[in-house]
A protein has these predicted regions:
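Outer-membrane beta-barrel translocator domains and adjoining extracellular loop/strand segments
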Residues: 119-131, 177-194, 238-247, 289-297, ...
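Short acidic/polar hinge/loop motifs at secondary-structure boundaries
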Residues: 24-52
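Extracytoplasmic beta-strand/coil segments of soluble accessory domains associated
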Residues: 1-27
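Face-selective signature of the C-terminal outer-membrane beta-barrel domain
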Residues: 149-175, 197-341, 364-369, 424
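N-terminal periplasmic accessory domains that precede
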Residues: 9, 32, 47, 58-80, ...
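Transmembrane beta-barrel wall of Gram-negative outer-membrane proteins
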Residues: 88-117, 132-179, 211, 219
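Residues that define the transmembrane beta-barrel architecture of outer-membrane proteins
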Residues: 89-93, 144-148, 207-211, 258-262, ...
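Outer-membrane beta-barrel signature, preferentially recognizing the C-terminal barrel domain
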Residues: 202-204, 301-307, 347-350, 378-431, ...
Length: 443
């Protein structure tokens, strides 16, 4: 696909950021699902670099994958295995079984993966305060973990115009995910060495069973099409960290996290005049509880964040000869409730109401295309950015978030052009409330 780079479930669209990926109209919420999708199962792939308002305000690009619908009756199955060798080996094995009768398709899938990652990082950090500090670090990191992912569900075609289905997707780490970071750090103050550390940090993450469920319905009634999807996700993690410097214990911590997500989306489309009208609603409810305990290097934290996102959208696309015009508007209501140790924090619990417009025009002639678009993008801070927990990096560095962060707003204009396999993109982006990280002396 043009403009797409990346691998192993991590993809970027040049100039648009991380894409939202759909398989047969269903949003992919777990990137390991892409690892389990085999190339010979894909019927078609489409990239949308100017997503309409049916997609969230933070979506800069969309990749839509359609798989081959298996035909025939009775039982079928497949087995696959992948192996790759870098500094460490990575293996992946899976099995898939299908039973089809009439319009009913029942499927069971299982996937086992063994992952070994090895990285080397060399960094230098300068801090200018009452003294000038330099921190030079060479660090080697090794991560090992094993995972199991399963999938059980069915699809049912009532007739050629209607279908529905459900799937349940459990998964877990087999044992702990173990990460070892080991390296040296040289600390200079005003050009003079004040410390030389040999640091060792070990992290063990135990993931309980995560669970996901999805249901869908797609139907056509006359000129109207109805597409409905609903999702549920649950996951929990327990992370323990141990750090030492020059063979002496310096810090320990533990972190327990629970996540819930409920989401639903309804999309209706119908022809209108010479074009197509689309409108619908989208709702997302999340609940995250994060408990952080430490050995005295900072403060314990007990944060809970509940978020409600309600959206309504409408757009209209109109083909006019070699031109295609799209205009749409999305309304988003976002409410956040932030709790510290069970107490609601009013000043950290904002409510936002935003209008998200999208407009584009595209010209296509033979092997040429030209496109001009303008849209608003809104990026909400991640949970890690909002946390009040102070986590250990090394003897001299700690890291924390900011519960007072507000959404980052972009007004972006794009010009795209292409001829055969040659593509060109130019963009202008005006950003408000831009996120950044900074270093300051401890208080």
């Amino acid at each position: 696909l043009p403009f797409v780079t990346g691998s192993d479930g991590e993809f970027t669209v040049l100039g648009r950021g991380t894409p939202e990926i759909y398989i047969n109209g269903r949003k992919v919420r777990d990137k390991t699902e892409l690892d389990r999708l085999q190339a010979n199962e894909i019927l078609s792939a489409e990239i949308i670099t100017t997503p309409g308002v049916q997609y969230g305000s933070s979506v800069g690009a969309v990749i839509r994958l359609h798989t081959i619908r298996k035909r025939g009756q009775g039982m079928s199955g497949s087995f696959y295995t992948d192996y790759s060798q870098g500094h460490e080996p990575i293996g992946n094995e899976g099995i898939s079984l299908n039973y089809r009768t009439g319009g009913l398709d029942i499927f069971v899938k299982g996937d086992f993966a063994e992952i070994n990652n090895h990285t080397t990082n060399i960094s230098s950090q300068d801090i200018y305060a009452s003294s000038d500090w330099n921190q030079s670090t060479e660090n080697k990191s090794k991560q090992t973990y094993r995972t199991f992912n399963g999938e059980l569900g069915f699809n049912y075609e009532i007739d050629e115009d209607q279908s529905f289905g459900m799937r349940y997707m459990p998964g877990t780490n087999i044992g702990n995910a173990h990460t070892t970071n080991e390296g040296t750090t040289l600390i200079l103050q005003d050009g003079k060495e004040v410390d030389h550390l040999h640091a060792l940090r070990q992290t063990d993450a135990h993931t309980g069973w995560w669970q996901a469920a999805n249901g869908y319905y797609n139907g056509t009634f006359g000129k109207w099409n109805i597409d409905f999807n609903t999702d549920y996700l649950y996951g929990r993690d327990r992370i323990r960290q141990y750090a030492e410097n020059n063979g002496i214990e310096d810090a320990t911590s533990s972190n327990r996290v629970r996540n819930h997500l409920y989401a639903a989306k309804l999309l209706l489309t119908a022809p209108l005049w010479k074009g197509k009208l689309s409108f619908g609603t989208e709702e997302t409810f999340t609940n995250r509880h994060d408990v952080f305990l430490q050995s005295g290097f900072s403060a314990d934290a007990d944060d809970r964040i509940k978020q409600t996102m309600l959206s309504g959208f409408i757009d209209y696309s109109l083909p006019l000869g070699k031109f295609n015009i799209l205009a749409g508007l999305r309304y988003e209501f976002q409410q956040t409730d932030y709790y510290e140790k069970g107490i609601h924090q009013d000043d950290q619990s904002p409510t936002y109401r935003d209008w998200i417009p999208v407009v584009s025009i595209r010209y296509t002639s033979g092997n040429w295309f030209f496109a001009l678009s303008h849209r608003t993008l809104k990026y909400s801070p991640s949970y890690d950015m909002l946390t009040s927990a102070v986590t250990y990096q090394n003897k001299y560095s700690y890291q924390s978030g900011d519960p007072f962060l507000v959404p980052q707003i972009h007004r972006a204009t794009f010009f795209d052009a292409g001829w055969k396999w040659v593509n060109f993109s130019l963009s202008y982006d005006h950003c408000w409330n831009m996120y950044t990280s900074y270093t300051r002396p401890s208080r």
